[in-house]
């Protein structure tokens, strides 16, 4: 995430440095691209956070299932 923001910052810095050599249309296009990329990064970050909770829930379910299996196995031992 930090690396992505660093890259985006470099793109913004590069576009401002090239402002003297570029047209306003090109600068506007680059700014639009940066905004689009920022939105995608935010969406991916939200998706990752949602997956973390799903993964934790799956781990908890697996632990409970393993515990039940362990309890069943101890009941059948002679």
Curated annotation (Swiss-Prot):
Name listed for the protein in its UniProt record: Major outer membrane lipoprotein Lpp
Organism: Escherichia coli (strain K12)
Gene Ontology biological-process annotations: lipid modification; periplasmic space organization
Additional record remark: About one-third of Lpp is covalently bound to peptidoglycan.
InterPro entries: Lipoprotein_leucine-zipper_dom, MOM_Lpp
Gene disruption: observed consequences: Double lpp-ompA mutants are spherical and only grow in the presence of electrolytes such as 30 mM Mg(2+), and are sensitive to hydrophobic antibiotics and detergents. The peptidoglycan layer is no longer attached to the cell outer membrane which undergoes abundant blebbing.
Key words, A-Z: Cell outer membrane, Cell wall, Coiled coil, Formylation, Lipoprotein, Membrane, Palmitate, Peptidoglycan-anchor, Repeat, Secreted, Signal
Membrane-crossing residue ranges in chain numbering: none
């Amino acid at each position: 995430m930090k690396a992505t923001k660093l890259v985006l910052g470099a793109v913004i810095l590069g576009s401002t440095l090239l402002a003297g050599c570029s047209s306003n249309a090109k600068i506007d296009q680059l700014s639009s691209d940066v905004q689009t990329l920022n939105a995608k990064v935010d969406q991916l970050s939200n998706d990752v956070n949602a997956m973390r909770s799903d993964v934790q829930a799956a781990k908890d379910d697996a632990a409970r299932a393993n515990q039940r299996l362990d309890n069943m196995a101890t009941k059948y031992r002679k």
